[in-house]
Amino acid sequence: MKHKNTVEPHDRMKLLNTERNTKMAASAHAYVRGSTARFYEWLETSDRAAIPEGPQAWICGDCHVGNLGPVASTDGALAIQIRDLDQTVIGNPAHDLIRLGLSLAMAARGSDLPGVTTAHMLERMIDGYEAAFTPETENEAPGASDNMPKSIRLLMREAAGRSWKHLADERIEGIAPTIPLGKRFWPLRQDERAAVDALFAEEALRRLATSLRSRRDDAPLRVMDAAYWRKGCSSLGRLRLAVLVAVGSGKAERHCLMDVKEAIAAAAPRSRTAEMPRNNAERVVAGACSLSPFLGQRMIAAQLLGQGGVHPRVAAAGLETGNRAPVARRGDGYGGVLGSRC
């Protein structure tokens, strides 16, 4: 059956490439968000003062305002953390600060805010970075700050209110749940669907899904539906799948929506001496566990279609809609898988 607004597999790449270019041309801020590689090329060729060398540590690598937001842990806690770590490496933290500062400046410019407002935004960014090194924050639980701004508290409340039911209403159809094909979700090739079934037959994926639904490790798991997921900006064109799985059986059966995303080599400069996983999916998961533990604990590295890295995530990077906050509370059934091209 042909679905309205859907795209067949053989037409994907042409449309995705066009859409990526269109999104990046929409505004200066959108261009900054979607041009990670060019950002680092610009830094390399800039004749300005040398970038200070910070301690070698895990960095986001693509730290812009769109990659920060509420993230939930498996037990329901919420915190503002990094939500996309495709570019994460062990590198220089100054790169994250410069990229985030540029993103904030472009967002302010696109909103016609005065220069003094932009300066204040950048000052607050540096203040926040410095505050993280104070003894008072060393043992502070994520998201537990009493000094959280009113706007951030509102964002956190909205995120906490978005349940699996809301997400299911947006993405799943019918009594026998399916992923609705259309503008956002597209049909898979036969070999892609077969690869998904094989992927979710693996024990590691079973444990990830059952843990999110508070089920035993040996609880039955079956793939109910899967589709290509049209999502992102600079990542458009990479393999990304939405997979709906059922965990358990009978009245105890619950559903999980899994995000399977291809991982590729990072453009962010990495430390020449630090040891980190060579597999791109394993690198992303390791970076997520270090920088965004709420996200990292719902992610796993795997292989799909012979590609050495896909990172399945149970609500890994979250399953957000547009600019809405992602929610993946325990029992809400969100998951993810990461994979990389070797």
Regions found by a protein language model. Name each.
Residues 1-60, 65-160, 213-342:
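Conserved ATP-binding subdomain of kinase catalytic cores across diverse folds
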Residues 135-205:
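Sequence-structural signature of the catalytic-core scaffold of metal-dependent phosphohydrolases
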Residues 179-227, 235-240:
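Bergerat-fold GHKL/Histidine-kinase-like ATPase
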